[in-house]
Amino acid sequence: MSYQDLFSPFEYKKLKLRNRFVMAPMTRMQSPDGIPGQPVADYYGRRAAAEVGLILTEGTVIERPASKNGKDIPDFYGDAALRGWKNVVDTVHAKGGAIAPQIWHVGDTPQGWTPPAPFEHPNEMTLTDIENTITAFGAAALAAKDLGFDALELHGAHGYLIDQFFWDHTNARTDEYGGSTIKERSKFAVEVIKAVRAAVGPDMTVILRLSQWKGKDYAARIATTPTEMEDWVLPLAEAGVDIFHASQRRYWEPEFEGSDLNLAGWVKKITGQPTITVGSVGLRTDVGELFSKGAGSDQANIDELVRRYDRGDFDLVAVGRQLLQDPEWVIKMKHQRFDELNAFTAASMGVLY
């Protein structure tokens, strides 16, 4: 295997990708009042035209109260928003690309959007709230299938709702959705996955994004040992996850002492399922530097990425900031047009192109 093997096709169930590169989901807040318009379709279409294998959209929210923390985060419900997403799907497919929505509920996130009217402090979800939220995830999954998306991703990472159930620092419940072990705290996620699988059937690829780190705590850990990792991810695979998107700030960092496997490598080793690795691909500094300091990043080679891919640690590679700044990053890498690549600038975050 070699560098060029990253540009080989990937197939899983009905999902067919022209290469191993995935556009990572990145919140843009460019959908006025939750409706993705033509600029959003053009944004994703540019990447499809430039041979990105799979596009994961920014997080798009289910139909539940407080599911988002910004008014211009796209909705994944309602006729107007779904018409907008249908246009996005058709645009990407016309360019030869594949696309999956990242289905999302932010949960308890105090930062961000100020609603137009006051609201009470977040309360613990009732059992009825949980049931209705699971139903809403299933409805969003069915909408993704009906709109012609090639796959879907559930956002279970970075301290948002599904992840808030996983983590013992945010899940203090004393009922069946809480508990002292990660296996107990995974009940909500398992039920969401089962609802999604029931909605889309056996053939549509379901991806789950997960992480150890949280938006508020980069040192956070859900699984501190491989055994705890097994207790975390095996029930999720059994519930219906096809591909795990294992989010790290730096893909080259080992997950546990005694092995250089990263998070994606461990999840693949434990579950046997395909995985996506992510985290500062092609860059020297991680996304934390961007969020905390507004910092850009110089380029970096992908020699270590190739080594880990050759070893079979993961199947797909998600690229975020490089593709945000340069829609043609994948095709430039494919043809080794390295002199055309630029350092990442924080100003790119404010541009939808």
Model feature map: region roles:
Residues 1-353:
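Flavin-dependent oxidoreductase catalytic cores
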